[in-house]
Amino acid sequence: MSEMTPREIVHELDRHIIGQDKAKRAVAIALRNRWRRMQLPEELRVEVTPKNILMIGPTGVGKTEIARRLAKLANAPFIKVEATKFTEVGYVGKEVETIIRDLTDVAVKMTHQQAMSKVQFRAEELAEDRILDILLPPARDQWGQNEENDTDSSTRQSFRKKLREGKLDDKEIEMDIAAPQMGVEIMAPPGMEDMTNQLQGMFQNLAGNTSKKRKMKIKDAIKAATEEEAAKLVNQEELKEQAIFSVENNGIVFLDEIDKICKRGDSSGPDVSREGVQRDLLPLVEGSTVSTKHGMVKTDHILFVASGAFQMSKPSDLIPELQGRLPIRVELEALTSHDFKRILTEPKASLTEQYKALMATESVNIDFSEDGINKIADAAWQVNERTENIGARRLHTVMERLMEELSFDATDRSDELLIIDEAYVNERLDELVENEDLSRFIL
């Protein structure tokens, strides 16, 4: 779990996301509170519940990007789901409990990788011993016991040194390797994923763990043997317990597009993918126990971060019980022309840097002048104002249109230096930006 301070988290988010300081502060505090809670005594820790967050803001202002970056910083089980993918229990489709099951799968995978990295050094030593036993079979006495003398030991150490230096990598040997488990693909209708997983596990268990002799290069043999030895050193039952503990105490669920499951005033009758989903989410957010293939998972201390544009609805259209379970509200601001300029230049992997790198692969060097960047930002902002406001995503459309000709001709323009300035941008975008009808269909 991440031990970064709120200031460090915000600083890290600033490297990738422009503006939206309120939202960054809210998620930074929420993430730090996860760590603070784990420092409390057991009896008090149980009482401290997470303060779930609702992020409200127009499309393309950074809600989903904050979630993506948070997942990398959290170092905790994290899953991002679209609220629109679920239906009410009893109807065809995915039910909301699959969120927790998927989160548990993520935690098991994370815990497994961490455990494997801890035993990596020991596993490599055991793998080397297996390879050396094949290269230098130990001498046996008359009773079949292994004999070891000083000469054998020094020869073994000499071979071990060569093995580590990679001098034997291309030599071929034959060794026993666990046969890969047969993957059984079962097609099932939506909502039947649990049954599918159980059947797949049953078929894999029937196959059993078999090994077979394979001829391979020593370089590949060491890799395969290391994975096998590491798996033997890891206790799978302990892993599952650690993963469930991690989900229950550090798990984070990001619910995107929550505004799309608000009940609209003009609709009548049951709405199984809207209000029904909200009702099903209530016990998860409030705290309940979900059955997974790894064990029972309590959701009392899982942090939920919901987000939505709320263009066709408003937060008060959510059912009151769900509103109460999302106590922290953060409003994200619409992006201005100045924000667009910063988005094009400040982030670590900004759009301009991406296009420079892509063109450099064709030996075409491009550079963006300051007035060129200003013009691109203005063009994107103007199109947003005149047509639909899709936020920073408009920059992708404008940039792709601007670079289309160069991308097509790049192979014929090797070793050329091209400055993209205001005149270059005007030549390619002016007509589209000024003509509202063209903007609607092309940008």
Curated annotation (Swiss-Prot):
Q: Which UniProt keywords apply?
A: ATP-binding, Chaperone, Cytoplasm, Nucleotide-binding
Q: Name one Pfam family in it.
A: AAA_2
A Gene Ontology molecular function term of the record: ATP hydrolysis activity
Please provide, in alphabetical order, the Gene Ontology terms of the cellular component aspect for this entry: HslUV protease complex
Q: List where the protein spans the membrane.
A: none
For this protein, the record's SMART domains field holds: AAA (SM00382), ClpB_D2-small (SM01086)
Keyword Nucleotide-binding applies: yes
The keyword Ribosomal protein appears for this protein: no
- Database matches in CDD domains: RecA-like_HslU
Disordered: annotated span: 141-165
Report the main location listed first in the record: cytoplasm
Which Gene3D superfamilies does the UniProt record give? 1.10.8.60, DNA helicase RuvA subunit, C-terminal domain (1.10.8.10), P-loop containing nucleotide triphosphate hydrolases (3.40.50.300)
How would you summarize the oligomeric state and partners of this protein?
Answer: A double ring-shaped homohexamer of HslV is capped on each side by a ring-shaped HslU homohexamer. The assembly of the HslU/HslV complex is dependent on binding of ATP.
Designated name of the protein: ATP-dependent protease ATPase subunit HslU
Please name the source species.
Photobacterium profundum (strain SS9)
- Per the record, the gene is hslU
